[in-house]
Amino acid sequence: MRKAKPKKRQILPDPVYGDVRVTKFVNHLMYDGKKNTAFSIFYGALDIVKTKHSNEEKSALEIWKAALDNITPQVEVKSRRIGGATFQVPTEIRPERKESISMKNLILYARKRGGKTMADKLAAEIVDAFNNQGAAFKRKEDMHRMAEANRAFAHFRF
């Protein structure tokens, strides 16, 4: 265990929307330090979402935020070894980790999707998550189902 907790790095808001969550998402999306490429993919995906949901009263950024909220898990299971047996113990997730998990899942399942460009795949996954569908939403439901099934072991909390 380390002695001092590392300092939180300050993340600057993105240039278009002025939102820190967007920058965090783009940082997860980025490969090999290519941040401009990641930003162009993200903004391209939001443009595609805007064209698909042009009749909605919500903006593309609001749809993205709602999609993230829809795929954010509340509980997860952690392995805990007790007396030779390993139990899956359901635990609450702290807010920063919730946000991180939801962003990583959205990106992971967008990458696994069939489609032309990454912007297309990301836009499709955002729209699905907004409508409570898609692989990222299914992942959240599976996490909740696992926690519910192992609720009997909740007293083994960490």
Swiss-Prot record:
One of its GO terms (molecular function) is rRNA binding. SUPFAM superfamilies: Ribosomal protein S7. InterPro entries: Ribosomal_uS7 (IPR000235), Ribosomal_uS7_bac/org-type (IPR005717), Ribosomal_uS7_dom (IPR023798), Ribosomal_uS7_dom_sf (IPR036823). GO terms for cellular component: small ribosomal subunit. It holds the Pfam family Ribosomal_S7. Keywords: Ribonucleoprotein, Ribosomal protein, RNA-binding, rRNA-binding, tRNA-binding. One of its GO terms (biological process) is translation. It comes from the Bacteria. Transmembrane segments: none annotated. One of the primary rRNA binding proteins, it binds directly to 16S rRNA where it nucleates assembly of the head domain of the 30S subunit. Is located at the subunit interface close to the decoding center, probably blocks exit of the E-site tRNA. Belongs to the universal ribosomal protein uS7 family. Part of the 30S ribosomal subunit. Contacts proteins S9 and S11. This is Small ribosomal subunit protein uS7. It comes from Porphyromonas gingivalis (strain ATCC BAA-308 / W83). The lineage of its organism: Bacteria, Pseudomonadati, Bacteroidota, Bacteroidia, Bacteroidales.
